[in-house]
């Protein structure tokens, strides 16, 4: 039997404009980490999300690293950060010799819990040891609840940095995540809703901060005719060729969001009657892009856990992936403090990301949904049969243990001797 075509989790989806812009870069010989496409990409990105200033960089990780440096994070500082995230949100904290303190999620959006963050900041304020910054991660295409987080940071004068690497196209009360904190980081990795193959963007309303970021990303070279350096810099600039790809991608952002939200709606309709399956909620405060459509699976009700389902789908050449393993459960961060943790732990124990690419066809989505439904129904039926077998065996066992009246007692028709004679 032929193996069906593989359905990937979140593959790149090109618009056709990318080739036009890349060809321009080659024809004009602008293939270095500077050029007209870089400048245009930065300008168009700002226009798209409502930011004032931006610098294109080599990755989302680079953007977070620069943001932390610009926030003044140094060795020995503490930085509060979401625990339910990818390691790239946290690694730059360690690059700088600072200590991450992980903050658990809340149930409504799966993002950082504002109440836990506020309590943590109050505690540190009483000790006179406030963190240098808060790195707020917006997960799977959905904004965190920003208002109370912004208020808590402002109350204690702690710099808020936004990791919006998964949230391009989402909204919070009409605003774009990544534009509300002091600095916002974005990623254009190959699996993102907009990709440059690899790349990132750092945005801010503070022009001086972005100018400094641009300098640091270009090996901190001073504006001199010779190579002059007064601080340590990095090779973090994005090439003109990759920026050309980004321009072609950014032009179709809205259609990509529409397609991913359509994926979610089709999954939800197809799996509505499957018990034990719940979709990541969409918080009331804004638009979820459904960058990933994510479900949680109750093994007691569904008869299958998230890993069983993942393996069953893999056997049908369908790629899925567990949700982020919380950072406080990662061996490399074993000694770090975590505020809460139960929500992120529960999500990791039950969560699964379904194929979510904007190029998926209705046939692809139906194939995935059918495979999920079939797996759960088959496992549930198998479990029901096993339960019946166990009950029958238990009944037979109980019967075998009951006393035999012909052995332990006298039959009623047997006449007993009268011992009084």
Residue ranges and their predicted role:
Residues 108-196, 201-203:
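Active-site phosphate-binding strand-loop segment of PLP-dependent enzymes
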Residues 36-43, 48-54, 115, 119, ...:
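PLP-dependent aminotransferase class I/II
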Residues 31-78, 92-94, 102-104, 126, ...:
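Phosphate-binding glycine-rich loop
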Residues 91-93, 152, 193, 241:
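Hydrophobic/aromatic ligand-binding patch that stacks against planar heteroaromatic rings
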Residues 85-90:
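Conserved coil-to-alpha-helix start sites within the AMP-binding
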Residues 1-31, 355, 416, 420:
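N-terminal "arm"/small-domain region of PLP-dependent enzymes with the aminotransferase-like
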Residues 97:
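Structured binding elements
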């Amino acid at each position: 039997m032929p193996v069906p075509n593989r359905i990937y989790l979140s593959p790149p989806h090109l618009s056709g404009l990318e080739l036009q812009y890349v060809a321009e870069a080659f024809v004009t010989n602008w293939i270095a980490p500077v050029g007209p496409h870089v400048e245009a990409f930065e300008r168009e990105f700002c226009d798209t999300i409502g930011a004032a200033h931006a610098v294109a960089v080599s990755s989302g990780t680079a953007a977070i690293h620069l943001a932390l440096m610009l926030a003044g994070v140094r060795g020995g500082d503490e930085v509060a950060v979401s625990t339910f995230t990818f390691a790239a949100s946290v690694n730059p904290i360690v690059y700088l010799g600072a200590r991450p303190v992980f903050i658990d999620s809340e149930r409504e959006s799966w993002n950082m819990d504002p109440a836990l963050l506020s309590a943590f900041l109050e505690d540190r304020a009483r000790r006179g040891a406030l963190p240098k910054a808060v790195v707020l991660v917006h997960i799977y295409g959905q904004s965190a609840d920003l208002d109370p987080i912004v208020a808590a940071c402002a109350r204690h004068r702690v710099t808020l940095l936004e990791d919006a690497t998964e949230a391009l196209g989402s909204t919070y009360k009409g605003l774009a995540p990544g534009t509300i904190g002091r600095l916002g980081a974005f990623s254009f990795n190959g699996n993102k809703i907009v990709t440059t193959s690899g790349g990132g963007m750092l945005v801010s309303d503070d022009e001086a901060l972005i100018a400094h970021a641009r300098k640091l990303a270009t090996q901190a070279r001073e504006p001199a005719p010779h190579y002059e350096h007064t601080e340590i810099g990095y090779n973090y600039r994005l090439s003109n060729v990759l920026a050309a790809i980004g321009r072609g991608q950014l032009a179709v952002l809205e259609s990509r969001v529409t397609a991913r939200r359509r994926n979610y709606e089709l999954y939800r309709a197809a799996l509505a009657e499957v018990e034990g399956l719940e979709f990541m909620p969409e918080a009331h405060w804004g638009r979820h892009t459904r960058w990933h459509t994510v479900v949680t699976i109750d093994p007691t009700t569904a008869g299958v856990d998230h890993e069983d389902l993942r393996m069953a789908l893999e056997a049908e050449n369908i790629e899925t992936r567990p949700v982020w393993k919380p950072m406080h459960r990662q061996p490399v961060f074993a000694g770090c403090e975590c505020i809460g943790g139960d929500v992120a732990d529960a999500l990791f124990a039950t969560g699964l990301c379904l194929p979510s690419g904007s190029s998926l066809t209705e046939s692809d989505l139906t194939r995935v949904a059918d495979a999920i439904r079939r797996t759960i129904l088959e496992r549930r039926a198998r479990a029901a049969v096993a339960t019946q077998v166990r009950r029958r065996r238990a009944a037979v066992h109980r019967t075998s243990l009951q006393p035999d009246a012909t052995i332990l007692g006298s039959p009623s028709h047997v006449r007993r001797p009268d011992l009084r004679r």
